[in-house]
From Swiss-Prot:
Origin species: Caenorhabditis elegans
Propeptide section residues: 189-191
GO cellular component, one term: cytosol
Name of the protein in its database record: Cell division control protein 42 homolog
A matching Pfam family: Ras
Gene symbol of the encoding locus: cdc-42
Domain of life assignment: Eukaryota
Amino-acid positions noted as binding GTP in the UniProt annotation, renumbered to this chain: 10-17, 57-61, 115-118
PROSITE patterns on file: RHO (PS51420)
Amino acid sequence: MQTIKCVVVGDGAVGKTCLLISYTTNKFPSEYVPTVFDNYAVTVMIGGEPYTLGLFDTAGQEDYDRLRPLSYPQTDVFLVCFSVVAPASFENVREKWVPEISHHCSKTPFLLVGTQVDLRDDPGMLEKLAKNKQKPVSTDVGEKLAKELKAVKYVECSALTQKGLKNVFDEAILAALDPPQQEKKKKCNIL
């Protein structure tokens, strides 16, 4: 059975672990516990063939900047995550996450993933953002950044409601199996 390695990166507390747990178990975790490193595996059928989708969760916190890239070798696709209600996490996509994965894995495709979309219209969240003269990141703005950074695609989801959740992983699988404008199956190698 062929394995697809998918590594999830992004700032701490943007919902990377919730995304993975909600997708793999259909349950939303009740408390926040920062991740050091975790992995999950699910079997998916693609064109009648079974594949193992290996999902690698990483720590977003700066303390792990030197440790995190150790999970990058042989990656088939990255999910670069930010919270649509945390504008700083969106800025870090350009400032930190895409440069980091591009440095270690320049040929590996990635998707830009906007998380926590259920909070985009939440009155309490909108009020909190407004106090800081901020607003949620719109779909258009996410798509524009994805195009600028040459992501395969921009996708959004809510791990809480599962809206768009399956689509994130379907698109990741497609990107891994058919990387656009590149030779097939360029994997990340760290020398």
